[in-house]
Amino acid sequence: MSTSNYINSFAPAKINLGLRIFGKRKDGYHELQTLMAPISIGDRIEITLLSSGIEFESTGDFDVPKDSSNLALKAALLFLSHHGLKTGLRIKLTKIVPPGAGLGGGSSDAAAVLFSLNRMLAIDETMENLIRLAAQLGSDVPFFLLRKPALCTGRGEILHPTSSFPYPRKGLLIYPGFPVSTPWAYKTYDELCKKGLILPSPSQESDKPVNDLEEAVFSKYLWLPAVKKWIQSHFNPEVCLMSGSGSSVFALFSKEDPRFFNDLIQQAQAYLGPGCWIRLFEILEQF
């Protein structure tokens, strides 16, 4: 819903259908290849234009920073500064996506703010320029501007939209109730590679999608491989992976029968207990 001074946007989470790492770059980032897809679970961003001042409010299922370290607010400040605008804003974030879960919630919020302000303020910035601006906020932010599945390379900011998606659309998503730090995950991966405890990507060819960060994250958070093994042994998914740098684990199924998914989520809730955030979702081909 939008008017000239108000817009209400959906900011979907994403999953990574594989994440391959091809070494560390001179700028400190890692060279990546990952297929990312938006899903039907997401936050909501409401923006109202004001005569002056910047107001930010966050409600919902999870607490997030309410200062300029929040990516949604940071995106708004960057957009206004980039275009030399003094417009006042009220931003209301309804937080549904757990932070620190490898689901890109903060990045999606930032992209939704950039996309919305570009429309509301009639800037008509090109997608290329918006993506360039988004890359200043984080490696995953450009992907959410594309609004469809994409193969992402570089540090994740180089986008290759995909028209063919070879995986099932329906799945189960589990957040264990604790976050994983992305810098820690990559640092641990590098350390384990140096010790020869993890083989680099070229040595790990696979017919199915692989997340190269799993071994690093699983080495500390033993609950995650246990959950992945439980899903694989009980429900035989087509794909079961940790998303991004964790901590969420997801599974995709080719089943269509609603009874299967009802049984799936009931068994997951019974096995994992009330401390886990468990949801069914669908992959979005466009949003």
Curated annotation (Swiss-Prot):
EC number(s) from the headed UniProt entry: 2.7.1.148
Residues annotated as binding ATP: 98-108
Gene3D superfamilies: 3.30.230.10, GHMP kinase, C-terminal domain
InterPro entries with a match to the protein in the record: GHMP_kinase_C_sf, GHMP_kinase_N_dom, IspE, Ribosomal_Su5_D2-typ_SF, Ribsml_uS5_D2-typ_fold_subgr
Active site (catalytic residues): 14, 140
Gene Ontology molecular function, alphabetical: 4-(cytidine 5'-diphospho)-2-C-methyl-D-erythritol kinase activity; ATP binding
Keyword terms, alphabetized: ATP-binding, Isoprene biosynthesis, Kinase, Nucleotide-binding, Transferase
GO BP, sorted A to Z: isopentenyl diphosphate biosynthetic process, methylerythritol 4-phosphate pathway; terpenoid biosynthetic process
Catalytic activity: 4-CDP-2-C-methyl-D-erythritol + ATP = 4-CDP-2-C-methyl-D-erythritol 2-phosphate + ADP + H(+)
Pfam families: GHMP_kinases_N
Pathway: Isoprenoid biosynthesis; isopentenyl diphosphate biosynthesis via DXP pathway; isopentenyl diphosphate from 1-deoxy-D-xylulose 5-phosphate: step 3/6
Role: Catalyzes the phosphorylation of the position 2 hydroxy group of 4-diphosphocytidyl-2C-methyl-D-erythritol.
Family: Belongs to the GHMP kinase family. IspE subfamily.
Entries under NCBIfam families matching the protein: ispE
The protein, known as: 4-diphosphocytidyl-2-C-methyl-D-erythritol kinase
Protein species of origin: Methylacidiphilum infernorum (isolate V4)
